[in-house]
Amino acid sequence: MEIKTKACNPTNHGKARDIDGIQYIVVHYTSNLGDTAKNNADYFAREKTKGSAHYFVDEHEIWESVPIEKVAWHCGGGLQGSGGHTFHKKCTNTNSIGVEICMLTKNAVVRKDSIRHAAEFVRWLMRQYGIDANHVIRHYDVTGKQCPASMVADQGLWDNFKAMLTQEETEMRYKYYEDMPDWAKRPLLSWCGKACW
């Protein structure tokens, strides 16, 4: 999994945290028409926004903006509206990873390839941090904010995204050993007897 990095402006995120305390992945969308993961990484590196996310994902790239060891400001704040917020006060900026999907075309059509790429990346994060699919939630589920709006307005779109997180991984292929989840590395090591690459 190739992840590019551009450090967020330090005024836009919080302090260091213990990554063993991560319990949730919160899915957002950027709401900007036709934007990219790189555009967002550039913007948050440059501007003082008092908000942030750990990652931005589009159909081609993943950009890390806030290191996972730091608190990103992506799901805090008060309640909005009357729906959602099932996870309010359970999921916080401190115990979650914020993932922003760049999902809208210039004509406000949902880019399905961005959603597929985001699901693949979230599934990778789930393995890395031991998070189950029930702890992958929308910003809407924390504060009631209509985010990601397409996945709030269309429950089926969210359900399809969640289904992608639990699909069998029999067809997963990895270019580099380091990208493999630990469960996949173990049989390879026992077969080789040692690092054989």
Task: Place the predicted regions along the sequence by residue.
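N-terminal catalytic cores of peptidoglycan-degrading enzymes
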Residues: 1-92
